[in-house]
Amino acid sequence: NLVQDRIELSIVKGGSKDQGDWGEFVLKNILESSGLKEPHDYETQKIFKDSDGLDKKPDVVVHMPGKRDLIIDSKVTLKAWHEYANTKDEKIKSMHFKSFLDSVKAALRSLEKANYQKIYDIQTLDYILMFIPVEPAFIAICNEGNDILQEAWKKKIAIVCPSTLPW
């Protein structure tokens, strides 16, 4: 619809902070609509110390049964995806898709560098979830970016979208 298109366009035209805030908003809405309550079931933007004494601030920490915690970090690459999805010319579309995949790879490197598994005060699972809030973008990664999924898995990162979150 027109309102949704205008909201999406304003987010795309905004900076990476606006896009990140939007991704976190989508993630939080999914958690709440699944019946999870903050701060009992999950926490957002909480600062933790890692084993080296450095501050770490994952987007979301979901508290699981058995005193285990699941870290979810929202990574939004809306600009590159929007350009790909809204281009008709196949040559330019291919160029934008490569740019989109490159931005996903950069997000993976950033998440790997954050090294959330080293957070001291929580018992993280072996894998971090990298949340991509745009379902068609996730599907495109699954269909065309198999090397990205394998790269993520090697880094102990699972890429997820709204429909693949585990609740």
Regions found by a protein language model. Give the residues of each.
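Amphipathic, heptad-repeat alpha-helical coiled-coil/stalk segments that mediate oligomerization
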Residues: 1-167
